[in-house]
Amino acid sequence: MKTPIELKILDSRIGSEFPLPAYATPGSAGMDLRAMIDTTLTIAPGETVLIPTGIAIHVADPGLAAVILPRSGLGHKHGIVLGNLVGLIDSDYQGPLMVSCWNRSDSPFALEIGDRLAQLVFVPVVQAQFKLVDEFDSSDRGEGGFGHSGTK
C-alpha cells in the first residue's frame, strides 16, 4: 500500500545531483535522508550539529506520522547517532526536515555533501483518550518495573 505524502524540494540539488528519497528495495521500511550541506562538515567528538536534508514534507493524514531514525552503519562504525535519538514529524508539520547528528565517538567525523545520514519512516498514529480509574484490572505483570521480567 502506498500513501501519497506531499514533498517540497528546498535544495535544487535534490532530483538533479542527488535522488529524491526512495525505498531501496520492496521490503525497505525507510527512505534515506541526505546531508544537503555546502561543504564537507567535520563533526568533532561530542559535538551535535543540525543538518538540513533539503526537503520538507506534509503528511496531512492525522492517522500517520513520520519518524527520523539513525542509519545503523553510521552509529556502529563511526559513532554518529541522532542527537535527539529519534525525530517525530507530526502530520500537520510543513517545515524543513533537519537531522540532529551527535558524534559520540572519540574521533572527528567528516560528513560529505549528499551523504546518507538518517532514514525517514512513516508510522500509524493512534490518539488516545484517557479514561480515569481508581484501580487497574489485575495483570500478570502488575507493577513490576525495570528488569522485572528477567533475562531468561
From Swiss-Prot:
Positions bound to substrate: 71-73, 84, 88-90, 98
Cofactor(s) listed in the protein's UniProt record: Mg(2+)
Biological role stated in the UniProt entry: This enzyme is involved in nucleotide metabolism: it produces dUMP, the immediate precursor of thymidine nucleotides and it decreases the intracellular concentration of dUTP so that uracil cannot be incorporated into DNA.
GO molecular function: dUTP diphosphatase activity; magnesium ion binding
Family that this chain belongs to: Belongs to the dUTPase family.
Hydrolase found in the keyword field: yes
Phylogenetic placement of the source organism: Bacteria, Pseudomonadati, Pseudomonadota, Gammaproteobacteria, Alteromonadales
InterPro entries documented for this protein: dUTPase, dUTPase-like, dUTPase-like_sf, dUTPase_trimeric
One Pfam family per UniProt: dUTPase
Pathway assigned in UniProt: Pyrimidine metabolism; dUMP biosynthesis; dUMP from dCTP (dUTP route): step 2/2
UniProtKB keywords: Hydrolase, Magnesium, Metal-binding, Nucleotide metabolism
Gene3D superfamilies, sorted: 2.70.40.10
Reaction catalysis annotation: dUTP + H2O = dUMP + diphosphate + H(+)
Gene this chain is encoded by: dut
Gene Ontology biological process terms, A to Z: dUMP biosynthetic process; dUTP catabolic process
Enzyme class: hydrolase
Annotated protein name in UniProt: Deoxyuridine 5'-triphosphate nucleotidohydrolase
Enzyme Commission designation: 3.6.1.23
